Structures are given as structure tokens and as C-alpha cells.
């Protein structure tokens, strides 16, 4: 699973706000191919955030499938995530895709894996990718010991992961959802 070693995606939920951010580095083995990739998307009219780690083509395929599930299920994040995970696990072509997703709406944050897992993390903090453990640790420390806004926690967590993980850079894209955002 070499493809998973290439990014950091982290999400933090605090109060009525959720932020999802990722770095911009794409690597092929140990070579940086691109430094400004967009691994975070707003879906379903801006009401859902999605971020991916893993093979780029695989992740785009999964994002498209997830968006189709959102349309089919009127934006219901939980049902859409479970349906995608079921397809991912049982469909012969999808089973070969190597990627992970974090998706979030105003109420839930979920990690979706190719093993058929749909996980809702405790404390509203989720991270995936090669720098995910570093970002999650930083996010948890900041979340528990400060009152910083979720987007600030995500930014600082990505900075820390970028300082430690060679597959994570400092070109960040962070999207938010909250009561002040027009969706």
C-alpha cells in the first residue's frame, strides 16, 4: 500500500463548526510530483466536505461515487457513507481502489475505508494519510488545551505534520462548514 504514504488530511469539529484540511503534495515513490494538489472538496451544494488520501485516480473515483450516493440519498451523510462502503467492499473493480476518505457535514464526521469501515471518531477529530497520526496528535492536544477555532487547529496540525512527515508539505487547503457559511 505504497500509495497511502503521501498526504495528510485532518478534520476537527468544535461546537457548530467543522474544518477539513489537507496538504498539497503528491508523490510518486520518493519523488514530489506536485506541491499544490487539491485533496479537499465541497460536495452536495457546499453542505458536505470530503478529503482523500491514497492513489489520486482511486480517490477521485471514490469521491465521484460518494457524491452520487449523496444525490441518491438527499444528502444523508451516514446512509451515503455506508452505501459507498458496501459498494467499495463488494464491487470487484472498487475493491482494488487504494484510498481513504474523510467526509463531514454539519452533524457528523466520518472516515470511510476500503475495508468497508465507516468510523465516526470520538471528539470530532479525524486524520488519515501518512502524516495522519502526527496531525491527529497535534489536533487533539490543541483541541483539549485551547479554545482555537477548528480551522486554526487544522492549520496548526497540518503545519506540525508537515514538519515531521516527508510526504506532507506546507501548501494547505482548508474548508469549513458552520452556521455562518452559506451552503
Swiss-Prot record:
User: So what EC number does this one have?
Assistant: 3.4.25.2
Summarizing activity control, the record says: Allosterically activated by HslU binding.
Superkingdom is Bacteria
Q: Which reaction does this enzyme catalyse, per its entry?
A: ATP-dependent cleavage of peptide bonds with broad specificity
Does the keyword Cytoplasm belong to this entry? yes
Location of the protein in the cell: Cytoplasm
User: Is Cytoplasm one of the keywords UniProt gives this record?
Assistant: yes
A biological process (GO) of this protein is: proteolysis involved in protein catabolic process
Keywords of the record:
Allosteric enzyme, Cytoplasm, Hydrolase, Metal-binding, Protease, Sodium, Threonine protease
- Database matches in PANTHER family: ATP-DEPENDENT PROTEASE SUBUNIT HSLV, METALLOPROTEASE TLDD
Q: What does this protein do?
A: Protease subunit of a proteasome-like degradation complex believed to be a general protein degrading machinery.
Description of how the protein assembles with itself and partners? A double ring-shaped homohexamer of HslV is capped on each side by a ring-shaped HslU homohexamer. The assembly of the HslU/HslV complex is dependent on binding of ATP.
The protein in question is named: ATP-dependent protease subunit HslV
Query: What is the organism of origin for this protein?
Result: Chromobacterium violaceum (strain ATCC 12472 / DSM 30191 / JCM 1249 / CCUG 213 / NBRC 12614 / NCIMB 9131 / NCTC 9757 / MK)
Taxonomy of origin reads: Bacteria, Pseudomonadati, Pseudomonadota, Betaproteobacteria, Neisseriales
Q: What gene name does this entry carry?
A: hslV
